Design a protein with these regions (language model features):
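C-terminal substrate-binding/catalytic lobe of Rossmann-fold NAD(P)-dependent oxidoreductases
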Residues: 1-86
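NAD(P)-dependent Rossmann-like dehydrogenase/reductase catalytic/cofactor-binding core
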Residues: 68-132
């Protein structure tokens, strides 16, 4: 379904840990860079808060080192050609951002799989001793 509608690349830049994603998409309807940026900003401040950061500053790759975000959306670089061909750029620290997501994943798994695991370790309680 997405064949021929999505193209992009990731580029290693000359910093120890920072990379960028160059994403080009063919939109279903016309959009302006401002509309795309507004949509990303809304999500970055909403359900993707802490994962995606919306950035309007003109920064360079080293500025994103040690960022805890999975992606830093570079709003000034958003471009649209003929209304439907959109290009967006996002930066990421491929070690620190990834590590933060792993910590969140492990925390989630621990809470879902064994919500009282830490309590078991600290207090030595067995499953039958837990109260709802």
């Amino acid at each position: 379904e997405m064949k021929g509608k999505l193209d992009g690349m990731a580029i290693r830049v000359p910093t120890p840990n920072v990379s960028l994603v160059d994403l080009v998409v063919d939109l279903k309807k016309d959009a302006t860079p401002e509309e795309i940026n507004l949509a990303v900003k809304k999500e970055a401040e909403g359900r993707l808060k802490g994962i995606v950061f919306y950035c309007e500053e003109e920064l360079v790759s080293i500025d994103f080192q040690s960022s805890p975000y999975s992606a830093i959306f570079d709003a000034p670089l958003t471009n649209v050609i003929e209304g439907r061909m959109a290009k967006v750029i996002a930066w990421y620290d491929n070690e620190w951002g990834f590590s933060n997501r792993l910590c969140e994943l492990f925390s989630f798994i621990a809470d879902v799989a064994r919500p009282n695991y830490l309590q078991d370790l600290v207090y030595g309680q067995t499953k039958s001793e837990h109260r709802c």
